[in-house]
From Swiss-Prot:
GO molecular-function terms, A-Z: DNA binding; DNA-directed RNA polymerase activity; ribonucleoside binding; zinc ion binding
EC number: 2.7.7.6
Binding of Zn(2+), residues: 1092, 1095, 1105, 1108
Zinc finger (C4-type): 1092-1108
Positions with a binding annotation for Mg(2+): 773
Keyword Transferase: yes
Name of protein: Probable DNA-directed RNA polymerase II subunit RPB2 homolog
Membrane-crossing residue ranges in chain numbering: none
Annotated GO CC locations: DNA-directed RNA polymerase complex
InterPro entries xref list: DNA-dir_RNA_pol_su2, DNA-dir_RNAP_su2_dom, DNA-dir_RNAP_su2_hyb_sf, RNA_pol_bsu_protrusion, RNA_pol_Rpb2_3, RNA_pol_Rpb2_7, RNA_pol_RPB2_OB-fold
Organism: Invertebrate iridescent virus 3
Length: 1140
């Protein structure tokens, strides 16, 4: 089908309306946290069972051989034990209110066996449903109670919002998320250039081989040393370099005797004969290795290339000599010693450390094929037939999501648990139920979740910051952003973080990682967010793929020949060779139609690669060929397209092997390019945060990046905020949907939980109070509720009993009450009454701490008191009982209106702080009497180039008088992008407005007409959580530090603002020396010391110098910190003098 006919059919099937319905159905079906939930479900259903089943037996050899075996592993739904010892279901909302962890039991059946060595029959007993650990359960997963109900039922019954898609955990009442971690791909050879200490660039082909079953990993490298191709192998825990020809011979493939069959292993063109001959010569140059290779030492190979025909003892002796000699040559350069190498060491090195991912059941033919493939790729890269691999290419990366991270941690803790079991069994025969219930798995997992340190103590590698609080809880958008975050962790030596390449945008990340949403500063380019359509594979094991290929009878046993090397391709399944086949064999592999599987033909390397490992980025995409060939009626549904294979998921390997159109017009603008795939939506290149920016293609990239950071700090409306008890949370009182929005915001219900207001914004210089980044606000608009917010602070008190210390919630006696505190607002139960107005010094919860030491009871009042800045009214009280102890939470709400110094920003990253609040009478007004809510400075537009704000203002102005849906569409890359502004201005004129969006305005102070017209219209603005009330502090006097006698630092400590070196220099150049003396001395740490005028030393008395005996001692003023400095210098043996 030619390009014109193809486009005609695609225009019909993939019209803009159909594509919009398909994309909307995609988000309705998959949501935004599917990658988190799916991987956790995979861990629960398969990963957890695999870890325990691999080492299900715990044995202890003694007089009576004692063993435990775990069977029938499963995870229970979260539950809680009440005070009356009844077990009931635990729901997320209750876990939040009671500061509990939302955990479920990992239960097993335990078979206990005791074998008597005296010949008696073994004693076998079995216990059922024995819990060995409690693990946190992800909300929305298969073992979460919320999965039993529909979203509407969850909101009505369980207090869980329909917009909350889950994907996070609840630990001690706090919502925490596992941040996905990027790592290098396993079992995939990568050629790169490495700089050595001699400042020479060395080409290396490296593969990190990781076994799927045992997780044993090692690195195999192919490189050239002194014109010889070498393989780095681990022998007795140290790396040695062995010529690749020797390794082939040790594996039973003698290059000298195999002839042309050895050449067919590499499947290289004739010009590479010299390299293959060099590999053959590695086995023939006996003098280079100091060993005598006789004819009896050689290997006779049969037609299949397997060694045979020689005595096994001679073959082993020859192999040992080779490795010993190579070890000796390495030792001369400071390497390992040659002593103690046996045939068992060599055998272990070849079987365990040479591609362990192939498994112990693999043949040496598979190791030879894979090693030959690495050598082939190395030679092709060396001769520049193929480019050097970029290690920052996402083709060579994988991402570890919640399921993989959980699996990694549980595996480490389970191994530690097994060692603990053996230790306790050695001491005594345990009570199985109590013994397993107190395992350290639960403690270790909860510690990792709480601290963010992901690993086991004393382990070589512990990642930090993996578990983070879902914070700030200011809007639904910030919640989604944290759940889709991806981090590239720093290397152990930290060198990668200093390079700029790792932080730059790589082309392979298109439509997988958002190019916009990344923080400023240290995390730029390493803290990323997934694109909206991006998903992550859960993985299918290599053995399952091989079984499917065998069951379908695909013949992969053909043999390569020199005559036709291009049509004989090596099949690699996750880096494991699985035979050879002609190029047309890929058509017989189409039955492997699974989201987790990708098949790619790489003719340059002569290989068919099948990837099914976990952690690959994938995205849905239109298959244009199948859509064009489809006969029948199209149903515009994502699920229907996916079921009919008109949409399929591709990973980076498949994306690189296909020609992908961004949108339909690419087919006509590039007629010479044959496109076989097309993106679902051009805006799919953005993440969920950048996807809500109107016209992001009409502003500079930095503005989009800044907005992605600021909008997550914008105060909005959090679902079910009245049921949650966060430590600090904010709520916008009158949120509004944006007039100009994007499709992604509509599809994901973000406009149902808005975080801004459509304010009337004028761009003008007015009185100078809006210079630079300042803005002017209308006081009447504020009085009507503009940007009014409520800040909720939660105070918690819990009863405890720990040894000699007991804490009770009760009213303390008058003898121990805290002075200057108001106890009049609390009720008889010791808790403040609802709807009370509280201020600094008021008691919210009365609590008494009882210390019983040496039979003496001491009572201390430890009540919860309102501090400065926490004033407000009692919004709600949560009173619960856990294990017989009360836990009380009091939520204080504080109404906050905008004030000078508060921070705001527009929906296009025009940030600013409030510089002045004018009454409406002083604000400029139009002929119709309209006054702006906000006035911003015109200088902010040329420097920041936020043209999208101008377009959005014009579009919003038009939409208020002509509510046509296309006049609120702020999507980027629209088909009418070049003419949209002209069209908007034309419709503005038709509706009686100036086509430029400007207005004639009059001064609010004089009533005179302002000579220039002013651009004014509705613009979506956010109020950020950075408020003056939380940050401003000052003091005249108060507490000082003990050591330096200077004022405390910090607002919470009653401290002041730091007067630093730069502030000192500013005052000094103005000549205000008396003010400088007041700031840095009189109001800081004034002190007087006695100084001898003769010797200049500090004296301990004012009558006589104890250094020189002089009576000429004078008292002088000096900062106390300076006195400390002089004394510390004297203590180090440095003599200091003061000249008076």
């Amino acid at each position: 089908m030619n390009q014109l006919n193809q486009k005609t059919k695609l225009d019909k099937h993939l019209s803009s309306d159909n594509r919009a319905k398909i994309v909307a159905d995609y988000f309705k079906t998959n949501g935004l946290v599917k990658h988190q939930i799916e991987t956790f479900n995979h861990f629960i259903s398969k990963g957890l069972k695999t870890i325990i089943n691999n080492e299900s037996s715990i044995k202890y050899q003694s007089h009576d051989n004692y063993s435990l075996k775990f069977t029938n592993i499963y995870v229970e739904y979260p539950s809680i034990i009440d005070d009356d010892r009844t077990i009931r279901d635990l729901y997320p909302q209750e876990a939040r209110n009671k500061d509990l962890s939302y955990t479920g039991n990992v239960c097993v059946n335990v078979i206990e066996m005791v074998e008597n060595k005296e010949g008696k029959p073994p004693q076998i007993s079995e216990q059922y449903r024995v819990p060995i650990a409690k693990i946190p359960i992800m909300l929305g997963s298969d073992v979460c109670h919320l999965s039993k109900y529909t979203p509407l039922e969850n909101e009505q019954i369980n207090g869980h919002s329909q917009a909350d898609q889950g994907g996070y955990f609840i630990i001690n009442g706090k919502e925490r998320v596992l941040i996905s971690q990027v790592r290098k791909a396993y079992n995939k050879p990568v050629c790169f250039v490495k700089s050595t200490s001699q400042k020479e660039d060395v080409l290396i082909c490296e593969m990190r081989s990781m076994c799927e079953e045992t997780f044993h990993s090692t690195s195999v490298q192919v490189k050239m040393i002194k014109n010889k191709i070498m393989v780095s192998l681990k022998l007795k825990r140290k790396l040695i370099d062995i010529p690749v020809g020797i390794v082939f011979k040790c594996l039973g493939y003698n290059p000298d005797q195999m002839g042309s069959k050895f050449r067919s292993l590499f499947n290289l063109p004739p010009e590479y004969e010299k390299y293959i001959d060099a590999i053959k010569n590695d086995c023939l140059e006996e003098f280079a290795y100091g060993i005598a290779v006789s004819a009896a030492d050689g290997d006779n190979s049969d037609s299949g290339g397997e060694s045979g025909g020689e005595e096994e003892a001679d073959q082993e002796e020859h192999i040992v000599k080779v490795f010993r000699n190579m070890s000796t040559s390495v030792d001369k350069d400071g390497g390992m010693a040659a002593t103690g190498i046996t045939i068992e060491d060599v055998q272990k090195s070849l079987d365990m450390d040479l591609f362990p991912h192939l498994g112990i059941t693999s043949t040496r033919k598979q190791r030879v094929d894979l090693l030959a493939f690495m050598v082939k790729k190395y030679l092709l890269t060396l001769t520049r037939k193929i480019p050097v691999d970029n290690r920052d290419d996402y083709n060579h990366k994988r991402v570890e999501t919640a399921g993989e991270l959980y699996s990694f941690l549980f595996r480490l803790l389970y191994k530690k648990f097994q060692k603990t079991c053996i230790t306790q069994i050695r001491n005594r025969k345990p009570d199985i139920s109590n013994f397993l219930r107190t395992s350290g798995i639960t403690t270790g997992i909860l510690y990792s979740f709480s601290s963010g340190y992901w690993g086991v103590q004393r382990n070589t590698y512990i990642r930090t910051g993996v578990s983070q609080v879902v914070n700030p809880k200011v809007s639904l958008l910030a919640n989604y952003s944290s759940l889709r975050r991806v981090v590239i962790p720093e290397s152990k030596d930290g060198k990668e973080a200093k390079t700029s390449e790792i932080r730059q945008i790589h082309p392979s990340s298109s439509f997988l990682v958002c190019p916009v949403e990344t923080p400023e500063g240290k995390g730029v380019g390493t803290v990323l967010n997934m694109a909206v359509f991006c998903q992550v594979t859960t993985g299918i094991s290599t053995c399952e793929i091989m079984d499917q290929i065998d069951s379908f009878g695909v013949d992969l046993k053909c043999h390569c020949t020199i005559k036709d090397p291009n049509n004989c391709l090596l099949l690699l399944i996750n880096g494991s060779p699985y035979g050879n086949g002609h190029a047309n064999v890929i058509h017989r592999l189409n039955f492997l139609n699974d989201t987790n599987i990708s098949i790619v033909v790489n003719r340059a390397l002569g290989v068919i690669e099948i990837f099914s490992d976990a952690g690959r980025f994938i995205r849905p995409i239109f298959d244009l060929d199948k859509i064009c060939n489809f006969e029948g009626e199209i149903v515009p549904s994502f699920k229907w397209f996916l079921d009919n294979q008109l949409i399929r998921y591709i990973d980076i390997n498949e994306a690189a092997a296909n020609s992908i159109a961004i949108e339909l017009r690419d087919l006509s603008t590039n007629p010479n390019t044959r496109y076989n795939l097309m993106e679902l939506d051009p805006c799919g290149m953005f993440g969920i945060v950048a996807g809500i920016i109107p016209f992001p293609d009409r502003t500079q990239s930095a503005r989009n990046c800044f907005y992605s950071s600021m909008v997550k700090q914008a105060i909005g409306f959090v679902p079910c905020h009245n049921l949650k008890t966060e430590t600090v949370s904010h709520t916008l009182n009158y949120p509004q949907k944006p007039l100009v929005t994007t499709s992604f915001a509509e599809y994901n219900q973000l406009n149902e939980y808005p975080n801004g207001i459509n304010a009337i914004v004028a761009i003008a210089c007015y009185t100078g109070y809006n210079q630079e980044d300042s803005i002017i606000l209308n006081k009447s608009s504020i009085d009507r509720g503009l940007f009014g917010t409520i800040t909720y602070n939660t105070f918690t008190a819990q009863e405890k009993k720990n040894g000699i210390i007991e804490e009770r919630i009760e009213i303390p006696s008058n003898a121990i009450k805290i002075r200057d505190c108001n106890y009049g607002l609390v009720g008889p139960d010791g808790i403040v009454r609802l709807r009370q107005r509280v201020k600094k010094g008021d008691v919210l919860i009365c609590k008494v701490t009882i210390k019983n030491k040496n039979q003496d009871e001491k009572l201390v009042d430890s009540s919860v008191i309102v501090q400065h800045g926490e004033e407000g009214y009692v919004d709600r009280i949560v009173d619960n009982v856990i294990d017989g102890c009360r836990i009380v939470k009091v939520v204080i709400g504080q109404m906050r209106t905008p004030e000078i110094g508060d921070k705001f920003c527009s929906g296009m990253a025009q940030k600013g702080t409030c510089g002045m609040i004018f009454p409406q009478e002083d604000m400029p007004f139009t002929a119709s009497g309209m006054t702006p809510d906000i006035i911003i400075n015109p200088n902010c537009i040329p420097s920041r180039m936020t043209i999208n704000q101008i377009i959005s203002t014009v579009m919003g102005k038009l939409y208020t008088v002509n509510p046509n849906p296309r006049f609120r569409n702020g999507n980027s890359f629209q088909e009418n992008s070049n003419t949209i502004l002209k069209e908007l201005c034309h419709h503005l004129k038709l509706n009686g407005f100036d086509p430029s969006g400007s207005e004639v305005m009059y001064s609010g102070f004089t009533g005179e007409r302002i000579q220039s017209t002013i651009f004014m219209g509705p613009t979506y603005y956010h109020r950020l959580k950075h408020m003056v009330k939380d940050k401003m502090h000052a003091r005249s006097h108060g507490q000082v530090t003990t050591l330096h006698r200077q004022p405390n630092c910090g607002r919470s400590q009653g401290g002041g603002l730091r007067f630093g070196e730069m502030e000192k220099d500013c005052i000094l150049v103005h000549g205000a020396t008396q003010f400088l003396n007041e700031r840095m001395f009189l109001n800081s740490d004034p002190f007087q010391i006695d100084v001898c005028k003769d010797c200049g030393m500090m004296s301990s008395t004012s009558k006589k110098c104890h250094h020189c005996g002089s009576i000429n001692v004078k008292r002088c003023n000096i900062p106390y910190s300076c006195k400390n400095l002089l004394q510390e210098l004297n203590g180090m043996g440095i003599k200091t003098k003061i000249d008076l």
